Amino acid sequence: MNTIIDFIHTNRDRYIDELKAYLAIPSISALPEHASDVRRCAEWTAEAMRRVGLDHVQLHETPGNPIVCGEWLKAEGAPTILYYGHYDVQPVDPLELWESPPFEATVRSGEIYARGAADDKGQVFMHLKAIEAHLRQTSKLPVNMKIVLEGEEEVGSENLDAFIRDRRDELSADVVVISDSPMFDRGVPSICYGLRGLTYFQIDLRGTASDLHSGSFGGAVANPAFVLSQVLAQMKDRGGRVKVPGFYDAVRPLREEERAEFKKLPFNEKHYRKEIGAPKLFGERDYTTLERLWARPTFEVNG
Protein backbone atom coordinates (compact mmCIF):
# COMPACT_ATOMS: atom_id res chain seq x y z
CA MET A 1 0.00 0.00 0.00
CA ASN A 2 2.87 2.41 0.72
CA THR A 3 4.09 2.17 -2.87
CA ILE A 4 0.60 3.04 -4.10
CA ILE A 5 0.41 6.08 -1.81
CA ASP A 6 3.89 7.15 -2.92
CA PHE A 7 2.82 6.84 -6.56
CA ILE A 8 -0.18 9.09 -5.87
CA HIS A 9 1.97 11.74 -4.16
CA THR A 10 4.56 11.60 -6.95
CA ASN A 11 1.90 12.14 -9.61
CA ARG A 12 -0.11 14.75 -7.74
CA ASP A 13 0.71 17.62 -10.10
CA ARG A 14 -0.14 15.50 -13.14
CA TYR A 15 -3.42 14.50 -11.54
CA ILE A 16 -4.35 18.13 -10.92
CA ASP A 17 -3.51 19.12 -14.51
CA GLU A 18 -5.57 16.24 -15.89
CA LEU A 19 -8.49 17.04 -13.61
CA LYS A 20 -8.38 20.68 -14.70
CA ALA A 21 -8.58 19.53 -18.33
CA TYR A 22 -11.58 17.35 -17.47
CA LEU A 23 -13.31 20.20 -15.65
CA ALA A 24 -12.68 22.56 -18.57
CA ILE A 25 -15.19 20.69 -20.75
CA PRO A 26 -18.61 22.41 -20.40
CA SER A 27 -20.63 19.18 -20.47
CA ILE A 28 -23.95 20.81 -19.55
CA SER A 29 -26.55 18.18 -20.39
CA ALA A 30 -29.53 20.49 -19.79
CA LEU A 31 -28.59 22.90 -22.60
CA PRO A 32 -28.86 21.66 -26.24
CA GLU A 33 -26.17 24.10 -27.36
CA HIS A 34 -23.67 22.08 -25.31
CA ALA A 35 -24.51 18.72 -26.92
CA SER A 36 -21.15 18.59 -28.70
CA ASP A 37 -19.36 19.38 -25.43
CA VAL A 38 -21.18 16.56 -23.66
CA ARG A 39 -20.08 14.18 -26.42
CA ARG A 40 -16.52 15.47 -26.22
CA CYS A 41 -16.57 14.88 -22.47
CA ALA A 42 -17.79 11.31 -22.97
CA GLU A 43 -14.89 10.68 -25.34
CA TRP A 44 -12.43 12.29 -22.89
CA THR A 45 -13.78 10.06 -20.13
CA ALA A 46 -13.43 6.93 -22.25
CA GLU A 47 -9.84 7.76 -23.15
CA ALA A 48 -9.02 8.43 -19.49
CA MET A 49 -10.43 5.00 -18.61
CA ARG A 50 -8.24 3.35 -21.24
CA ARG A 51 -5.16 5.19 -19.99
CA VAL A 52 -5.58 3.95 -16.42
CA GLY A 53 -5.73 0.34 -17.62
CA LEU A 54 -9.42 -0.57 -17.84
CA ASP A 55 -10.45 -3.10 -20.46
CA HIS A 56 -13.28 -3.11 -23.02
CA VAL A 57 -13.92 0.62 -22.72
CA GLN A 58 -16.86 1.63 -24.90
CA LEU A 59 -19.21 4.50 -25.59
CA HIS A 60 -22.69 3.00 -25.68
CA GLU A 61 -25.03 5.10 -27.76
CA THR A 62 -28.47 5.94 -26.36
CA PRO A 63 -31.29 8.15 -27.68
CA GLY A 64 -29.59 10.84 -25.61
CA ASN A 65 -25.98 11.07 -24.44
CA PRO A 66 -23.52 8.16 -24.50
CA ILE A 67 -22.98 5.89 -21.49
CA VAL A 68 -19.30 5.08 -21.01
CA CYS A 69 -18.39 1.64 -19.67
CA GLY A 70 -15.19 -0.22 -18.88
CA GLU A 71 -14.07 -3.06 -16.66
CA TRP A 72 -11.21 -4.95 -15.06
CA LEU A 73 -12.16 -8.55 -14.23
CA LYS A 74 -8.92 -10.35 -13.42
CA ALA A 75 -9.22 -10.78 -9.62
CA GLU A 76 -10.26 -14.41 -9.59
CA GLY A 77 -12.46 -15.30 -6.64
CA ALA A 78 -12.74 -11.67 -5.49
CA PRO A 79 -16.03 -9.74 -5.34
CA THR A 80 -17.11 -7.48 -8.19
CA ILE A 81 -17.81 -3.79 -7.64
CA LEU A 82 -19.92 -1.79 -10.07
CA TYR A 83 -19.01 1.89 -9.85
CA TYR A 84 -21.55 4.43 -11.13
CA GLY A 85 -20.90 8.11 -11.79
CA HIS A 86 -21.70 10.81 -14.34
CA TYR A 87 -19.72 13.17 -16.52
CA ASP A 88 -22.43 15.76 -17.21
CA VAL A 89 -22.76 18.91 -15.11
CA GLN A 90 -25.34 21.53 -14.13
CA PRO A 91 -25.70 24.92 -15.87
CA VAL A 92 -23.59 27.70 -14.39
CA ASP A 93 -25.95 30.69 -14.23
CA PRO A 94 -25.88 33.17 -12.62
CA LEU A 95 -22.28 33.70 -13.70
CA GLU A 96 -21.84 36.82 -11.56
CA LEU A 97 -21.91 34.68 -8.41
CA TRP A 98 -18.78 32.77 -9.42
CA GLU A 99 -15.49 34.01 -7.98
CA SER A 100 -13.64 32.39 -10.91
CA PRO A 101 -14.78 31.14 -14.34
CA PRO A 102 -16.74 27.89 -13.87
CA PHE A 103 -14.82 26.00 -16.56
CA GLU A 104 -11.38 27.30 -15.65
CA ALA A 105 -10.51 25.24 -12.58
CA THR A 106 -8.91 27.35 -9.86
CA VAL A 107 -7.15 26.13 -6.72
CA ARG A 108 -7.80 28.28 -3.65
CA SER A 109 -6.64 27.31 -0.16
CA GLY A 110 -5.89 23.80 -1.34
CA GLU A 111 -9.36 23.27 -2.85
CA ILE A 112 -10.26 23.14 -6.52
CA TYR A 113 -13.18 25.24 -7.75
CA ALA A 114 -15.00 24.56 -11.03
CA ARG A 115 -18.35 23.27 -12.23
CA GLY A 116 -18.23 19.51 -11.76
CA ALA A 117 -15.38 19.46 -9.26
CA ALA A 118 -17.71 18.06 -6.60
CA ASP A 119 -20.56 16.77 -8.79
CA ASP A 120 -19.43 14.48 -10.24
CA LYS A 121 -16.23 14.70 -12.28
CA GLY A 122 -14.03 15.01 -9.21
CA GLN A 123 -15.30 11.72 -7.78
CA VAL A 124 -15.11 9.95 -11.15
CA PHE A 125 -11.54 11.12 -11.57
CA MET A 126 -10.63 10.03 -8.03
CA HIS A 127 -11.78 6.46 -8.68
CA LEU A 128 -10.00 6.26 -12.02
CA LYS A 129 -6.74 7.45 -10.52
CA ALA A 130 -7.04 4.99 -7.63
CA ILE A 131 -7.35 2.22 -10.22
CA GLU A 132 -4.36 3.59 -12.11
CA ALA A 133 -2.20 3.70 -8.98
CA HIS A 134 -3.01 0.09 -8.10
CA LEU A 135 -2.40 -1.21 -11.62
CA ARG A 136 0.81 0.75 -12.15
CA GLN A 137 2.31 -0.39 -8.85
CA THR A 138 0.94 -3.91 -8.40
CA SER A 139 -0.43 -4.83 -11.85
CA LYS A 140 -3.68 -5.89 -10.20
CA LEU A 141 -6.71 -4.75 -8.24
CA PRO A 142 -7.93 -6.33 -5.00
CA VAL A 143 -11.44 -6.60 -6.51
CA ASN A 144 -13.05 -6.84 -9.92
CA MET A 145 -14.33 -3.53 -11.27
CA LYS A 146 -17.08 -2.51 -13.64
CA ILE A 147 -17.53 1.18 -14.47
CA VAL A 148 -20.72 2.85 -15.73
CA LEU A 149 -20.59 6.61 -16.34
CA GLU A 150 -23.58 8.41 -17.82
CA GLY A 151 -24.11 11.83 -19.34
CA GLU A 152 -27.70 12.54 -18.33
CA GLU A 153 -27.74 12.41 -14.53
CA GLU A 154 -28.39 16.12 -14.27
CA VAL A 155 -31.47 15.84 -16.51
CA GLY A 156 -33.13 12.79 -14.97
CA SER A 157 -31.14 9.81 -16.34
CA GLU A 158 -33.83 9.20 -18.94
CA ASN A 159 -31.94 6.43 -20.75
CA LEU A 160 -30.19 4.75 -17.84
CA ASP A 161 -33.02 2.39 -16.82
CA ALA A 162 -33.33 0.85 -20.29
CA PHE A 163 -29.55 0.53 -20.55
CA ILE A 164 -29.37 -1.37 -17.27
CA ARG A 165 -32.34 -3.60 -18.08
CA ASP A 166 -30.83 -4.55 -21.44
CA ARG A 167 -27.50 -5.46 -19.81
CA ARG A 168 -28.50 -6.99 -16.49
CA ASP A 169 -26.12 -9.94 -16.81
CA GLU A 170 -23.28 -7.85 -18.20
CA LEU A 171 -23.57 -5.38 -15.30
CA SER A 172 -24.10 -7.92 -12.51
CA ALA A 173 -22.01 -7.21 -9.42
CA ASP A 174 -21.79 -7.96 -5.71
CA VAL A 175 -22.09 -4.33 -4.72
CA VAL A 176 -22.73 -0.98 -6.39
CA VAL A 177 -20.70 2.07 -5.37
CA ILE A 178 -22.08 5.52 -6.12
CA SER A 179 -19.97 8.56 -5.25
CA ASP A 180 -22.56 11.23 -5.85
CA SER A 181 -23.89 12.06 -2.41
CA PRO A 182 -22.61 14.28 0.41
CA MET A 183 -20.13 13.33 3.10
CA PHE A 184 -21.29 13.52 6.69
CA ASP A 185 -18.70 16.19 7.41
CA ARG A 186 -15.34 17.42 6.19
CA GLY A 187 -12.81 14.64 6.60
CA VAL A 188 -15.51 12.13 7.56
CA PRO A 189 -16.11 9.58 4.77
CA SER A 190 -19.67 8.28 4.61
CA ILE A 191 -21.35 5.12 3.40
CA CYS A 192 -24.92 5.86 2.29
CA TYR A 193 -27.08 2.73 2.20
CA GLY A 194 -30.27 4.47 1.15
CA LEU A 195 -31.48 7.69 -0.44
CA ARG A 196 -34.87 9.35 -0.67
CA GLY A 197 -36.48 9.20 -4.08
CA LEU A 198 -38.47 11.97 -5.71
CA THR A 199 -42.01 12.31 -6.98
CA TYR A 200 -43.08 15.70 -8.25
CA PHE A 201 -46.37 17.23 -9.34
CA GLN A 202 -47.19 20.50 -11.05
CA ILE A 203 -50.33 22.36 -10.03
CA ASP A 204 -51.91 24.76 -12.51
CA LEU A 205 -54.80 26.69 -10.97
CA ARG A 206 -56.91 28.99 -13.12
CA GLY A 207 -59.65 31.22 -11.75
CA THR A 208 -60.83 33.35 -14.65
CA ALA A 209 -60.59 33.31 -18.43
CA SER A 210 -57.94 36.07 -18.41
CA ASP A 211 -55.81 38.17 -16.08
CA LEU A 212 -57.82 40.64 -14.02
CA HIS A 213 -56.67 43.93 -12.55
CA SER A 214 -56.72 43.71 -8.75
CA GLY A 215 -57.87 47.32 -8.42
CA SER A 216 -60.88 46.74 -10.64
CA PHE A 217 -61.84 43.18 -9.75
CA GLY A 218 -60.23 42.45 -6.37
CA GLY A 219 -62.82 41.28 -3.86
CA ALA A 220 -65.26 40.13 -6.53
CA VAL A 221 -63.60 36.82 -7.45
CA ALA A 222 -61.23 34.41 -5.75
CA ASN A 223 -57.54 35.08 -6.33
CA PRO A 224 -55.90 31.81 -7.53
CA ALA A 225 -52.68 32.67 -5.67
CA PHE A 226 -54.55 32.79 -2.35
CA VAL A 227 -56.52 29.63 -3.13
CA LEU A 228 -53.31 27.77 -3.97
CA SER A 229 -51.67 29.06 -0.79
CA GLN A 230 -54.60 27.74 1.25
CA VAL A 231 -54.34 24.32 -0.41
CA LEU A 232 -50.60 24.08 0.19
CA ALA A 233 -50.94 25.25 3.79
CA GLN A 234 -53.06 22.18 4.52
CA MET A 235 -50.41 19.71 3.36
CA LYS A 236 -48.62 19.69 6.75
CA ASP A 237 -49.73 20.11 10.33
CA ARG A 238 -48.05 22.54 12.71
CA GLY A 239 -45.56 19.87 13.74
CA GLY A 240 -44.38 19.22 10.20
CA ARG A 241 -46.21 15.93 9.65
CA VAL A 242 -47.65 15.52 6.14
CA LYS A 243 -51.45 15.28 6.20
CA VAL A 244 -51.96 13.68 2.78
CA PRO A 245 -53.92 10.42 3.37
CA GLY A 246 -51.74 7.35 2.88
CA PHE A 247 -48.53 9.38 2.61
CA TYR A 248 -46.67 7.31 5.21
CA ASP A 249 -48.29 3.92 4.52
CA ALA A 250 -45.30 2.35 2.73
CA VAL A 251 -42.57 4.03 4.80
CA ARG A 252 -40.36 1.50 6.57
CA PRO A 253 -40.05 2.37 10.26
CA LEU A 254 -36.56 3.00 11.55
CA ARG A 255 -35.16 0.06 13.45
CA GLU A 256 -33.98 0.76 16.97
CA GLU A 257 -30.42 -0.22 16.05
CA GLU A 258 -30.51 2.31 13.20
CA ARG A 259 -31.69 5.06 15.53
CA ALA A 260 -28.91 4.10 17.94
CA GLU A 261 -26.30 4.33 15.17
CA PHE A 262 -27.62 7.74 14.11
CA LYS A 263 -27.27 8.98 17.70
CA LYS A 264 -23.60 7.98 17.79
CA LEU A 265 -22.75 10.43 15.02
CA PRO A 266 -21.17 13.73 16.09
CA PHE A 267 -24.00 15.85 14.70
CA ASN A 268 -24.30 19.34 16.14
CA GLU A 269 -27.72 20.86 15.46
CA LYS A 270 -26.59 24.39 16.33
CA HIS A 271 -23.66 24.11 13.92
CA TYR A 272 -25.92 22.66 11.21
CA ARG A 273 -28.48 25.44 11.66
CA LYS A 274 -25.77 28.08 11.48
CA GLU A 275 -24.20 26.45 8.42
CA ILE A 276 -27.45 26.55 6.43
CA GLY A 277 -28.45 29.97 7.78
CA ALA A 278 -31.78 28.90 9.29
CA PRO A 279 -33.27 30.67 12.34
CA LYS A 280 -34.48 27.30 13.66
CA LEU A 281 -34.93 23.68 12.60
CA PHE A 282 -38.36 22.24 11.90
CA GLY A 283 -39.94 18.87 11.19
CA GLU A 284 -41.73 15.84 12.61
CA ARG A 285 -41.52 16.08 16.38
CA ASP A 286 -40.90 12.40 17.08
CA TYR A 287 -37.76 12.27 14.95
CA THR A 288 -34.32 13.83 15.18
CA THR A 289 -32.98 16.07 12.43
CA LEU A 290 -30.82 13.28 11.01
CA GLU A 291 -33.74 10.87 11.06
CA ARG A 292 -35.90 13.39 9.20
CA LEU A 293 -33.15 13.99 6.66
CA TRP A 294 -32.15 10.39 6.07
CA ALA A 295 -35.08 8.13 6.86
CA ARG A 296 -38.32 10.08 6.54
CA PRO A 297 -40.16 11.35 3.46
CA THR A 298 -41.10 14.99 3.19
CA PHE A 299 -43.46 17.21 1.21
CA GLU A 300 -41.90 20.41 -0.15
CA VAL A 301 -42.95 23.22 -2.47
CA ASN A 302 -40.90 24.67 -5.32
CA GLY A 303 -42.00 27.57 -7.45
Task: Map each language-model feature to its residues.
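Short small-residue beta-strand/loop micro-motif enriched in glycine and branched aliphatics
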Residues: 112-114, 209-215
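Acidic-enriched catalytic cores of C-N bond-cleaving enzymes acting on peptides and small amides
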Residues: 184, 193, 214-303
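Flexible glycine/proline-rich, aromatic-decorated loop/lid segments
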Residues: 190-206
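Conserved active-site and cofactor/substrate-binding residues in soluble primary-metabolism enzymes
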Residues: 10, 14, 36, 40, ...
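Acidic/histidine-rich catalytic neighborhood of metal-dependent amide-processing enzymes
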Residues: 112, 118-194
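Acidic/His- and Gly-rich active-site-bordering loop/insert found
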Residues: 2-117, 136-143
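Predominant activation on well-ordered alpha-helical scaffold segments within soluble catalytic domains
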Residues: 46, 125-132, 161, 225-233, ...
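Generic secondary-structure signature for well-ordered alpha-helical cores
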Residues: 13, 24, 50, 136-139, ...
